[in-house]
Amino acid sequence: MNKYIWLVRLWHSKEEPMFLRSVSSSFIFIHGVPRKLKTRTVFPTLCGTRRASFAAISVYISEDESFQEKRIDSVENRGIRPNHQTLKWLLEGCLKTNGSLDEGRKLHSQILKLGLDSNGCLSEKLFDFYLFKGDLYGAFKVFDEMPERTIFTWNKMIKELASRNLIGEVFGLFVRMVSENVTPNEGTFSGVLEACRGGSVAFDVVEQIHARILYQGLRDSTVVCNPLIDLYSRNGFVDLARRVFDGLRLKDHSSWVAMISGLSKNECEAEAIRLFCDMYVLGIMPTPYAFSSVLSACKKIESLEIGEQLHGLVLKLGFSSDTYVCNALVSLYFHLGNLISAEHIFSNMSQRDAVTYNTLINGLSQCGYGEKAMELFKRMHLDGLEPDSNTLASLVVACSADGTLFRGQQLHAYTTKLGFASNNKIEGALLNLYAKCADIETALDYFLETEVENVVLWNVMLVAYGLLDDLRNSFRIFRQMQIEEIVPNQYTYPSILKTCIRLGDLELGEQIHSQIIKTNFQLNAYVCSVLIDMYAKLGKLDTAWDILIRFAGKDVVSWTTMIAGYTQYNFDDKALTTFRQMLDRGIRSDEVGLTNAVSACAGLQALKEGQQIHAQACVSGFSSDLPFQNALVTLYSRCGKIEESYLAFEQTEAGDNIAWNALVSGFQQSGNNEEALRVFVRMNREGIDNNNFTFGSAVKAASETANMKQGKQVHAVITKTGYDSETEVCNALISMYAKCGSISDAEKQFLEVSTKNEVSWNAIINAYSKHGFGSEALDSFDQMIHSNVRPNHVTLVGVLSACSHIGLVDKGIAYFESMNSEYGLSPKPEHYVCVVDMLTRAGLLSRAKEFIQEMPIKPDALVWRTLLSACVVHKNMEIGEFAAHHLLELEPEDSATYVLLSNLYAVSKKWDARDLTRQKMKEKGVKKEPGQSWIEVKNSIHSFYVGDQNHPLADEIHEYFQDLTKRASEIGYVQDCFSLLNELQHEQKDPIIFIHSEKLAISFGLLSLPATVPINVMKNLRVCNDCHAWIKFVSKVSNREIIVRDAYRFHHFEGGACSCKDYW
């Protein structure tokens, strides 16, 4: 201490040597000024008029706030002429001690008086002081008058303007900076991007800034790229954000969090989760913010399995006590309906903040627990936490979910009392409350009372009218937005587009699309995905694809929406192709894409690829999602994998109707009709509710098995559950009775349909046609036209088939020619087949050949097969060989062609040619499908093959068959035996093995069934001439009705005649 006293004494002496002045100043610099000397009394005396010492002491006392005003006054009062160093330290003192704005202005005045305003260092200090005190005008004035500005000065000014959301000024300053040849650096772009994030900036401006960043070589700067990722993500350009992220060679925590958060917010949740996993695998420790973003993604895709895995990682890494992470977990569990886990986390939290309560209240509100949300709100009060706008908005949301309008009105009054009435969130929640409670008048009144500049409220009104399917008012609101110059955001256009989708208004949707293009929102991932969804659902798949390729980039939602569109319209091959292209571009599918890809595999019965997608879903964590499980049930059941179908079915939630329907439908479509019916019976036994889809599949299964008894049982359940008035179900029943051989029941069912549509008429017309009642089919067609029901392609198939079966060639040709002229229908291949069949049945083979050669489309195999079959009947070898030649070009391995050609040679007695044809079949490994017939006796299905001797009653059946044949021969039956004799001659086999299966089935039926029961037989091939003749005579000698359903139609035999009138 003595050294300081000595120094003071020297300063108080009247005659101090010059060298002591320099010594004392140096001493102060070295040792500093002790606190005891820092007093109001010592300071003025010590300073005297010595400028150098004053400046030196200023360095040490600048941290003492009590000296700020005193020392500045000393400068003015004592007439000291401070130098630039003194003023610099005084300014630093003002900054360190938070001096008043007036003090700084005094110093600024001194600087101007002394002409030191050109001093760059002083200008920087003054500039910093004004910025520190928030005097933007003073800072800008100093900035403009600076002789030279460093890059740091520019950056400070830009950041200050950005913090005040003065976007125009930021860009103006940036342009000025570049024009003055100042090279921007990381800090510059950071400030500019901050300004962009704070306001609405046109996309092309952001692109220009990005281009400048690349030009300056800052593509690897996290300082610049992290906010750029966030900016792109915030505005929905997640693909561009990902491009910036992928371009960073060294990514920091903020880079990962920005990208994960951006993906999560832009409905790329699956990609966000995968990116989080990549980050963890690379050894980068997740931050609470990273956990929050990825948990938010899990919440959006509703994946409890992934959420629980992340919860485990939270515990493992020691984040279980982090309030930020716990809040995200509570929100996740509440959203997924796991209230126990959410409340457990809440109760174990060491610290709960307002966000915690808000999260819990919001979770309860979203789950529909309005009462619990209100109780928690009261507890929040008891814990001394005040509600904020988020709390009150969540409580209003709870009222919206519960539909409790009265409580919502009370909250409305409460928010007004607390001064939150003009809060944007609460305004949106209240408006949504009135809209969802269908109080559209109050909603509109409230909307008009609010600050209509808030785009969120406009969006709510768009959604409100959309919920009412009021497209006119929805569009009116949209037009009013444009008049009021309300700038749309990424949710505005999707709101009205979704209404267009629901109402099927493509024209208005296209108008909205044009507005989207004008405002450059087509690059927004969310808008792009909704546009694709609209065009896909409304049938313009090519337009949807064009948008996907041009604008979607790597947005997984857009790609999976496109896949779903193809699946909806049964373009399963395109759906799978798109799915593969998505994977090839490095886009990992979400649960929507995987589900629709599996559905496409089911439609194509592509089992192997479906199993690969199943494995991919297991790896991705989506295999337990209910829609995916239902798609798996459909895949395996349609592919005939019964065991795998039930395994997938057992993984679904109990009682899920979609899974049950998938099982019934899948088995039915794969031909496992008995299994489909067993599942249907089990459904009813377990009390599972049926619907149109269930009954439709069950009825079709009964149709395919031609099991009249089971069909009637299904019909009984339909009647019991009240679905017998549903037109779709009734239509299926008409077809079922027709396929089971009961045309009378089909007629009865048709008459009971209250609202007949084109499917109803088609069902009865085709039923009459298949059963050989051509006149009735044509009468029904006339009634259909008179009922103002427009026919379609299916109708005309039934009409032309009816004309064919009853030999009305000219009338049939007239119907065919009227398809385009009267009904606007272009003939399809099946219509050409009907005409060829019509001509050939009438023996007009040459005319049929000419008709085929003049077809505007290439004849398919069925056309040529129809002609060849007729040539066998009419023994026309020339045209038959011509047809066979074309048929073998199309289907060289088809056994039916060789069989028909062999039969043609046989009926033409060209035995060598016949044998050569059969030899070719053997060489090519082509095998003829064996004939098989079925008949139901005493609730059991009995199956017979040609010459079958395996039945337990084979001897009795063959013996009875011989008796029937003898009796038929006595009244005129003559066996077509030349082919049989040739078989016997060449193959030297027992004649019994050439008895066709339908003859054995009929013999067994007549032997076993009561005399009053019709004989119902099914056959997999077409009935031959000999069998047809034999059955006609047997129906007469047995006095029984015999119904045979072959591969082409029904034959009703009774009294020695057939309903087909020998045209089959």
Curated annotation (Swiss-Prot):
GO molecular function, one term: zinc ion binding
InterPro entries named in the record: DYW_dom (IPR032867), E_motif (IPR046848), Eplus_motif (IPR046849), Pentatricopeptide_rpt (IPR002885), PPR_At4g14850-like_plant (IPR046960), TPR-like_helical_dom_sf (IPR011990)
Protein name according to UniProt: Pentatricopeptide repeat-containing protein At4g13650
Region (Type DYW motif), start-end ranges: 970-1064
Gene name for this UniProt entry: PCMP-H42
Pfam families: DYW_deaminase, E_motif, Eplus_motif, PPR, PPR_2, PPR_3
GO BP: any one term: RNA modification
PANTHER family to which the protein is assigned, alphabetical: OS07G0578800 PROTEIN-RELATED
Region named Type E motif: 863-938
Superkingdom classification of source: Eukaryota
Region (Type E(+) motif): 939-969
Key words of the record: Repeat
Organism: Arabidopsis thaliana (Mouse-ear cress)
Family as reported in the entry's similarity comment: Belongs to the PPR family. PCMP-H subfamily.
Segments annotated as PPR repeats: 83-118, 119-149, 150-184, 185-220, 221-251, 252-286, 287-321, 322-352, 353-387, 388-422, 423-453, 454-488, 489-523, 524-554, 555-589, 590-624, 625-655, 656-690, 691-725, 726-756, 757-791, 792-827, 828-858
